[in-house]
């Protein structure tokens, strides 16, 4: 998937605007602040070392008679000693101050980075492609609903909500779901889901709750990981398609409505996804949710200097287009489901 010539023109014009350049510079400053702090400490240590080595060398040279003792040499040695003491005190103070405020400052910088990137970089790119779209940075897709379509985890981190403001009320977010576990070397994150979650209005005749989750097989054992199973008042059902039963588990509260939904067209579409996506699906009577676990964050800001240097506005625009292309593919599948919509 690529960009049209018109889209390329729009985003290149956007990239050259003063506001975009100013925001990008601010992002670069956020990502390089720790490097600048490290350079500051290295510079202080170098100056401290220079002062003490310089003072010691002058003292040794005068004691050996290589340099004549004079008021100038004495004053210079005294200056170097005082500067050394100053830089030593400054270094100790800086280390204590950094240890005191550094962690909190870093957390604030991360929050600032996300907000700045979504509002001043991602949103303008999105609006260049889809003029009526916006990013809601104040809310999440309802966490209780997100938990119905992704693996059970301790923590769920969402991006801002990308909204097309169309008749489907399409919303999408990056989602990172993970647990924190303790190992021999301390605590570490265990990723359960990394990808995108989509939500649209349920304008179809799908009743009750329906959940379709991917499965994996090893020898004779089936495993659906941490994906949720049967909901309250629900049950697990199978379909006649063997391939579908091998790759997905289906749970519902209204079997009649679910079987009406699971036409050969829908089943074939889900089967076609197995080689491309790890797709899960959940619906209630108001909204439909589907999640694409692809181990990618489409909407995340660069997290370090290397990713900042590798960032390209064209690639970001293509990822945005792909996300909505995938959402359109799911929606079209639902509409093509003859006799259902």
Language-model segments: residues:
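Cytosolic juxtamembrane N-terminal segments of multi-pass membrane proteins
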Residues: 1-41
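Charged, low-complexity intrinsically disordered regions
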Residues: 123, 127-131, 135-178, 187-341
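Canonical alpha-helical transmembrane segments of integral membrane proteins
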Residues: 38-64, 89, 93
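Amphipathic coiled-coil alpha-helices
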Residues: 30-44, 87, 105, 109
């Amino acid at each position: 998937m690529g960009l049209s010539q018109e889209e390329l023109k729009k985003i290149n014009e956007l990239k050259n605007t003063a506001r975009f350049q100013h925001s990008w510079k601010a992002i670069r400053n956020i990502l390089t602040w720790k490097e600048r702090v490290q350079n500051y400490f290295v510079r202080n240590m170098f100056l401290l070392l220079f002062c003490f080595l310089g003072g010691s060398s002058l003292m040794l040279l005068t004691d050996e008679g290589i340099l004549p003792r004079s008021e100038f040499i004495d004053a210079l040695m005294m200056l170097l000693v005082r500067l050394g003491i100053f830089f030593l005190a400054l270094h100790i103070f800086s280390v204590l101050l950094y240890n005191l405020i550094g962690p909190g400052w870093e957390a604030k910088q991360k929050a600032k980075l996300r907000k700045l990137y979504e509002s001043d970089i991602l949103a303008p790119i999105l609006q260049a492609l889809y003029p009526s779209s916006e990013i809601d940075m104040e809310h999440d897709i309802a966490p209780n609903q997100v938990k119905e379509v992704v693996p059970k985890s301790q923590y769920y981190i969402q991006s801002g909500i990308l909204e097309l403001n169309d008749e489907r009320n399409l919303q999408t977010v990056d989602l990172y779901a993970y647990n924190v576990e303790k190992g021999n070397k301390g605590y570490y994150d265990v990723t359960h889901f990394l990808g995108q979650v989509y939500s649209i209005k349920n304008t179809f005749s799908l009743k009750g709750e329906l959940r379709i989750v991917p499965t994996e097989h090893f020898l004779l054992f089936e495993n659906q990981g941490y994906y949720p199973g049967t909901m309250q008042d629900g049950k697990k059902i199978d379909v006649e398609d063997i391939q579908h039963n091998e790759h997905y588990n289906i749970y519902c509260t209204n079997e009649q409505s679910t079987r009406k939904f699971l036409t050969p067209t829908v089943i074939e579409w889900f089967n076609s996804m197995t080689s491309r996506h790890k797709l899960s699906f959940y619906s209630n009577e108001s909204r439909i949710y589907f999640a694409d676990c692809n181990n990618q964050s489409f909407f995340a800001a660069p997290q370090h200097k290397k990713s900042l240097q590798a960032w390209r506005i064209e690639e970001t625009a293509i990822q945005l287009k792909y996300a909505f292309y995938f959402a359109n593919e799911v929606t079209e599948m639902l509409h093509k489901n003859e006799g259902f919509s």
